[in-house]
Structures are given as structure tokens and as C-alpha cells.
Amino acid sequence: MAQVSMRDMLNAGVHYGHQTRYWNPKMKPFIFGARNGVHVINLEKTLPLFNEALAELTRISSNNGKVLFVGTKRAASEAVKAAAVDCQQFYVNHRWLGGMLTNWKTVRQSIKRLKDLEAQTQDGTFDKITKKEALMRTRELEKLELSLGGIKDMAGLPDAIFVIGADHEHIAIKEANNLGIPVFAIVDTNSTPDGINYIIPGNDDATRAIQLYLDAASAAVKEGRGSNVEAELQIPAE
């Protein structure tokens, strides 16, 4: 069972919040105190919440659920992509386009265009058009890949989103709320826990902390996917 320990979180600096003057009072239940003008997150609150979230991610994945990893801050971007790829799920790590979930029909058209352009790079189309046109299409492809590359094979809305940095990704959270998609999110002391189904109070800036969250979430998803495969193998042939 995918779990984290108190020692793991301490070593990764999960307990370091933001400066006290930037705090959101709604995070008070999860704050232990302050040290040198910086809030300290109560890891005795975080630990059970995080492990509960991991168990639910495993359950969702065991039912073939799709998990969308979201983290567009510079500190999280590459790690978000790596974690999603590692567990064969989906990601948005560059910029959240408004309507990415709530206007899925339009996003799907953009994904179709992305795949068409990818096909053109392989089937010789680019050799048959002018260099200027080929350059324009290449730039369009690069732009679409940056925005939509992580969801181009998602084939429908996700069953959950796992967010690094609730404050930074508030638009994604709001869209998920509007559609009833469960939200799992790392919530720092300057953020609001509103609209988050699975609150994980913790540092959302430190690279080591971000890596800890993503490694654990990816492991939980892989565990769920593995149990699903095992269940299928045990179904007797008719």
C-alpha cells in the first residue's frame, strides 16, 4: 500500500509554510505554529490526510479511473510530467487553458488538430508544402504539444485531478468542482482549502517536497492499476 511516513515528510521539508503575513486563516486548523516569521504546518494533521488521499487514488485507479496531474509552477513542471508518465496517466504542466475541463468539446478539437499535425510530420506532408508553411505548422504543433501534449490521449474527462499548489491552480480546481471531479491538492498556508475534496496541507514550493508528493501519488496509481490487472487475470475464461 502506497504510504508516506512522518520522517519522509520532515526530510522533504513538507512542514515549512509561507511567511505568516501571507497566511490564509482557513488553513489555521492545519498550522502548528510559527518560527522566525514562517508558519509551520502540523504534520500530524498532514500524515493521515495524505495517506487517506493515496488510498483513494489507488481505489480510483483500480476501477480504471483516469488521473490528471496538474502543476504549472516552474518548481513542479518537469516533476509533474515525469510522475504522470511513470504511472501512465495525464498531465498539464505548462499553462492551464481556461475551459480545459469545462469546455472539453472545444479542447478535443484542438487535440485532433495536434494529432493531425503529428501525422503530417510522419507521412511526408511537410515535404510537399512550402518551407514557410511547414515552419508555421511546426510552430503550431509545438504550441499545441506544450499545452495539450499531456492530455492528448486522455479520451474524455479525468476521474480525479492531483494538484501541486492549490493557490496557483485555482482555475483548474474550480473547473473540476463545476463538473464534480474529485480534487486532490497540496495546500500551503497561503492558500484556501475550499473546493478541495482531499486536502494535503504542505509546502508547495520546495522541490524535495513536490517530488515526495508526486512519487507517492504515482506509486498509489500504479498500485491501483496493478490490482486491476491482477483482477482481470483472475477472471475465469468462459
From Swiss-Prot:
Gene Ontology process terms (BP): translation
Top-level taxon of origin: Bacteria
Ion transport among keywords: no
GO molecular function, one term: structural constituent of ribosome
Keywords: Ribonucleoprotein, Ribosomal protein
InterPro entries: Ribosomal_uS2, Ribosomal_uS2_bac/mit/plastid, Ribosomal_uS2_CS, Ribosomal_uS2_flav_dom_sf
Record-annotated disulphide pairs: none
Keyword Isomerase: no
NCBIfam families: rpsB_bact (TIGR01011)
Name of this chain's protein: Small ribosomal subunit protein uS2
Originating organism: Haemophilus ducreyi (strain 35000HP / ATCC 700724)
Gene (UniProt): rpsB
